[in-house]
Amino acid sequence: FPEEVLKCTTGFGTGMGGSGNVCGAITGSVMAIGLKYGRVDIENDNAKVFEKVNDFITRFNGRYKKQDCSGLTCAWREKGTFKTPERRKFCSAIVGFAASELEKVL
């Protein structure tokens, strides 16, 4: 990826800047879908993007049932063990799953 892409996605981590909101794997995937199918003119239809995003979200929800970082990682948050290798491994698995499903959607 270009350095600019990595820079602009840095804030996605831990549910948007550590806020616990939407999982960065989802947000990054939606960005990738937009990059491929997005419109450049506001007059153009966005139905294809919405279809692809909803397909991806359905796949993600089928596996994880939640979209927010807080909900996905609540076991670690409740125990105060968020910054552990186990939680990082879990999140890496989420990112891997998201990438795999994104590839199918694209």
What are these regions (language model features)?
Residues G17-M31:
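Conserved phosphate/anionic-ligand binding catalytic regions in large, soluble enzymes, centered on
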Residues G17-G18, D41, N61:
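Amphipathic alpha-helical interaction elements
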Residues T10-G17, K36-Y37, W76:
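Acidic, glycine-rich active-site loops and adjacent beta-strand->loop/helix elements
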Residues K48-L106:
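C-terminal binding/interaction regions
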Residues V30-G38, S100-K104:
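Short glycine/serine- and small hydrophobic-enriched flexible loop segments
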Residues F1-C8, I33-K52:
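Phosphate-handling active-site elements
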Residues F12-G20, K83-R87:
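A short glycine/serine-rich beta->alpha loop
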